[in-house]
Amino acid sequence: MSANDTISDMLTRIRNACAVRQTTTQIPTTRMTRSIAQVLKDEGFIADFEEVGEGIKSQLVLSLKYKGKNRQPIITTLTRVSKPGLRVYSNSKDLPRVLGGIGIAIVSTSKGIMTDREARKQNVGGEVLCYIW
C-alpha cells in the first residue's frame, strides 16, 4: 500500500495496534519514520524498533509498550498536527507544551526531528508534526 502522508500512516498504524493490544506493528521505512521511531523510543513510548528487509520494501517493526495486568497502552493519544494540506510551524518560544509537559510534541527542525523540549533547549523552531501522550 502506498501512502502519500507517511507520518499519518505511521501514527494510524500505531494507534490501531495499541487499540487491539498487539505487541508489534510494521511501518514502511523512510528517513522521517525512522527518526520519529527513534524519538518515541528515546521518550519511552515504544520498547524498541528494528528495520527488516532491504531497499524500497524495508519495514520498521515497532515493539509497543503496555503497563499493568490489563495491558493498558503507554501511548493513549496520537494526534497529527501539521498535515500536507495545512502545515503548522512554530518558533522556539511558541512551541506547544502538551498536557503541561506530560506529553510530547514531535517537531521537524533544521537540526533534525526532536521533541518540543529539545527544540526549546536548542532554541530552534520548526514544523510541529504531532502530539503524543
UniProtKB/Swiss-Prot annotation:
InterPro entries on file: Ribosomal_uS8, Ribosomal_uS8_CS, Ribosomal_uS8_sf
Record GO terms (molecular function): rRNA binding; structural constituent of ribosome
Keywords: Ribonucleoprotein, Ribosomal protein, RNA-binding, rRNA-binding
Keyword Nucleotide-binding listed: no
Gene Ontology BP, a term: translation
Cellular component terms per the entry's GO annotation: ribonucleoprotein complex; ribosome
PROSITE patterns found in the cross-reference section: RIBOSOMAL_S8
UniProt entry tagged with the keyword Membrane: no
Self-association and partners: Part of the 30S ribosomal subunit. Contacts proteins S5 and S12.
Functional note: One of the primary rRNA binding proteins, it binds directly to 16S rRNA central domain where it helps coordinate assembly of the platform of the 30S subunit.
Family listed: Belongs to the universal ribosomal protein uS8 family.
Protein name, entry field: Small ribosomal subunit protein uS8
Native source organism of the sequence: Microcystis aeruginosa (strain NIES-843 / IAM M-2473)
Gene for this chain: rpsH
